[in-house]
Amino acid sequence: MVMAKVDPNEGLQEKLVQVNRVAKVVKGGRIFGFTALTVVGDGKGKVGFGRGKAREVPAAIQKALEAARRNMIQVELNGTTIQHPMKARHGASKVYMQPADEGTGVIAGGAMRAVLEVAGVQNVLAKCYGSTNPVNVVRATFNGLKSMASPESVAAKRGKSVDEILN
């Protein structure tokens, strides 16, 4: 259940990944509420995710979008794909992502696809193992994207040239 929208003010793409109805049981019955999980990105490497909780769906989505805008990270992309193959995890969710050639497209499951698309990744092969809980898959994908490093940054950290790193 991924819904997409482009925010005209900031040029951010917004995607709703999940809305979940939750219930609090009280003496008089149940009180229902909603949680929402959203991802936002500028399509150029900036991406964030957020969760919101409220009694009504629109309020939960709005809170989630605000949280996502506050929780953005910058990802160094290699053109339209990721820098290198990577594995990441969060809880029991494990994700594997690898760069793909031009024209491949985003081959990834629901929650991962939403994150990668708003980040601006257009060609990637990705797989989710273990738990497919959307919240944990999004967090695992973020962990992977955060850990990704360009050859230039690795070379600078090691004090070597880019050619030495790549060969």
UniProtKB/Swiss-Prot annotation:
Gene Ontology cellular component terms for the protein in this record: small ribosomal subunit
Family per similarity comment: Belongs to the universal ribosomal protein uS5 family.
Subunit structure: Part of the 30S ribosomal subunit. Contacts proteins S4 and S8.
Alphabetized UniProt keyword annotations: Ribonucleoprotein, Ribosomal protein, RNA-binding, rRNA-binding
Domain statement: The N-terminal domain interacts with the head of the 30S subunit; the C-terminal domain interacts with the body and contacts protein S4. The interaction surface between S4 and S5 is involved in control of translational fidelity.
Domain called S5 DRBM: residue spans: 12-75
Top-rank taxon: Bacteria
Record-given protein name: Small ribosomal subunit protein uS5
InterPro entries tied to this protein: Ribosomal_Su5_D2-typ_SF (IPR020568), Ribosomal_uS5 (IPR000851), Ribosomal_uS5_bac-type (IPR005712), Ribosomal_uS5_C (IPR005324), Ribosomal_uS5_N (IPR013810), Ribosomal_uS5_N_CS (IPR018192), Ribsml_uS5_D2-typ_fold_subgr (IPR014721)
GO biological process per UniProt: translation
Single GO MF annotation: structural constituent of ribosome
Organism ancestry: Bacteria, Pseudomonadati, Pseudomonadota, Gammaproteobacteria, Oceanospirillales
Function: With S4 and S12 plays an important role in translational accuracy.
Gene: rpsE
Pfam families per record: Ribosomal_S5 (PF00333), Ribosomal_S5_C (PF03719)
UniProt-listed Gene3D superfamilies: 3.30.160.20, 3.30.230.10
